[in-house]
Amino acid sequence: MVLGFTYTFVTKQGVFSEKKLAYSATTSNMEMISIEKAKELYESQSALFVDARHDFEYKMGHIRGAMNIALKEIDTHRIQLENISKEKMLIVYCDGVECNSSIELALKLMELKFTNVKVFFGGWQEWKAKKYPIDKE
């Protein structure tokens, strides 16, 4: 019980309080896309999906054809990124609405001069729930 009170005091939210988005979309000029738009772009093959999760999460399952660039490891992917056109549409995602790695990675990609970056904020959880194409390694 003491732990519960401590948690509530420190976080300013209760254990059973309503979940909030990890990152407010209004604080960024980032274009957020819906699951429907993500699926449309996936089917048209006009975009490269970029998974911002850790490598071990990516290996457990990811959107089919997605490239893994973990947010914390972006520097190790510089050569890979140099081989992608700066105009190529990149759809960045992470685990879901409680994960903001997709937004942070998208901002870093924009800093690297990629001009067509979008965020699929529903991410892996929403994609998997719809039973859309996935791969595992």
Identify what each model region corresponds to.
Residues 43, 48-72, 91-94:
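Mid-length scaffold segments of soluble, non-membrane domains
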Residues 82-127:
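Catalytic cysteine-centered active loop of the rhodanese-like fold, especially the PTP/DSP P-loop
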Residues 72-75, 98:
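Short beta->alpha connector loops
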Residues 131-137:
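Active-site neighborhoods of enzymes that stabilize oxyanions during catalysis
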Residues 26-28, 64, 95-97:
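Second-shell loop/turn segments in exported
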Residues 39-41, 75-87:
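Short amphipathic alpha-helix with an adjacent loop that forms part of the alpha/beta core around
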Residues 1-48, 55-60:
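Flexible, polar/low-complexity N-terminal or interdomain linker segments that lie immediately upstream
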